[in-house]
UniProtKB/Swiss-Prot annotation:
Belongs to the bacterial ribosomal protein bL21 family. Part of the 50S ribosomal subunit. Contacts protein L20. This is Large ribosomal subunit protein bL21. It comes from Prochlorococcus marinus (strain NATL2A). One of its GO terms (biological process) is translation. InterPro entries: bL21-like, bL21-like_sf, Ribosomal_bL21, Ribosomal_bL21_CS. It comes from the Bacteria. GO terms for cellular component: cytoplasm; ribonucleoprotein complex; ribosome. Keywords: Ribonucleoprotein, Ribosomal protein, RNA-binding, rRNA-binding.
């Protein structure tokens, strides 16, 4: 038998980058340049949203675990479309009672694309400037 030598796959650190975030009451494992379906959110198509509830972040070199959230971590997502999921049939039956009930529904979903996952110095912080109004005395 001849030995098959497989060429080593070049690992791209971008392939290893992922984050676990909390969104719409659930936890999602997100990777860059992939799309996911969330529960319907009140955003328009092509809006860019920022998720800051990052529970875990792996950037290919380092693994950061939040307590409960990773500080200064954010995930930017772009809303692609609003859609409906597959039809779900709910069938309830009581045996020997001739009672049957069949209902169905389709879940409202929002499809998003993960644009970037960043932490620390990569994030832009907006500084709030506090302004005070000066009193004008009338004579």
């Amino acid at each position: 038998m001849a030995d098959k030598k497989s060429s080593p796959k070049k690992e791209n650190p971008q392939d290893k980058t992922y984050a676990i975030v909390e969104a719409s009451g659930k936890q999602f494992w997100l990777q860059p340049n992939r799309y996911y379906d969330f529960d319907r959110c009140q955003a328009e198509v092509d809006d860019v949203l920022t998720l800051e509830n990052v529970l875990l972040l792996n950037d290919g070199k380092d693994l950061k675990l939040g307590k409960p959230y990773v500080k200064d971590a954010k995930v930017e997502i772009k809303v692609l479309e609003h859609r409906r999921g597959p039809k779900i049939i709910v069938y309830k039956m009581r045996p020997k009672k001739k009672t049957r009930r069949k209902n169905g529904h389709r879940q409202e979903l929002t499809r998003v694309l993960v644009q970037s996952i960043s932490i620390g110095s990569n994030t832009k912080k907006s500084k709030a400037v506090k302004t005070t109004a000066s009193k004008v005395e009338s004579e």
